[in-house]
């Protein structure tokens, strides 16, 4: 299972559904975000369960969203493998600046292909395939 942590914004939602989710699914993971979980529980319970149950997490920290940072901290406390991506390297929280981060820029040519390759190779690396 892969749980994705990210802000819910129009452009980022598009990137999730057209790029991130399909790329990770190609690697054999069942991919979900909290807004894809239906039920009557408090959303924070769905988020913490999603993080705890995941074998892999992807966190897009674009925009310094406080909810994303909270969830990233929770994943860190649970010692989860997290692939961090962002559109702006300065959005990386201080405590994570020592980590490898995938930076992407939607204004660059073929950015989507580059991001897909980087995510795919990183999944291989953290899964021990490479």
Predicted regions and their residues:
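Cross-kingdom TIR/SEFIR domain
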Residues: 61-123
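Conserved N-terminal substructure of TIR/SEFIR domains
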Residues: 1-40, 47-50
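Short, flexible, glycine/charge-rich loop motifs used to bind or transfer phosphoryl groups or to couple energy/partner
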Residues: 46-48, 91-92
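Short, surface-exposed alpha-helical recognition segments that flank or form part
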Residues: 35-38, 42, 110, 114
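An anion/phosphate-binding loop that grips the pyrophosphate of nucleotide cofactors and donors
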Residues: 54
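Defense-system signaling and execution modules centered on TIR/cGAS-STING-like, death/scaffold domains
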Residues: 1, 123-130
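A generic local structural motif
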Residues: 43-46, 70
């Amino acid at each position: 299972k892969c749980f994705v942590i990210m802000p819910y914004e129009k452009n980022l939602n598009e990137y999730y559904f057209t790029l991130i989710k399909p790329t990770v699914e190609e690697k054999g993971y069942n991919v979900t975000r909290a807004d894809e979980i239906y039920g009557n529980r408090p959303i924070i319970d769905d988020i913490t369960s999603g993080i705890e149950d995941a074998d892999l997490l992807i966190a897009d920290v674009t925009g310094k969203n406080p909810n994303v940072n909270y969830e990233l901290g929770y994943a860190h406390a649970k010692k989860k493998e997290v692939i961090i991506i962002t559109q702006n390297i300065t959005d990386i929280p201080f405590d994570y600046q020592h980590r490898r981060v995938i930076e992407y820029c939607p204004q660059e040519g073929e950015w989507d292909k580059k991001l897909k390759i980087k995510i795919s190779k990183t999944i291989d690396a953290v899964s021990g395939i490479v």
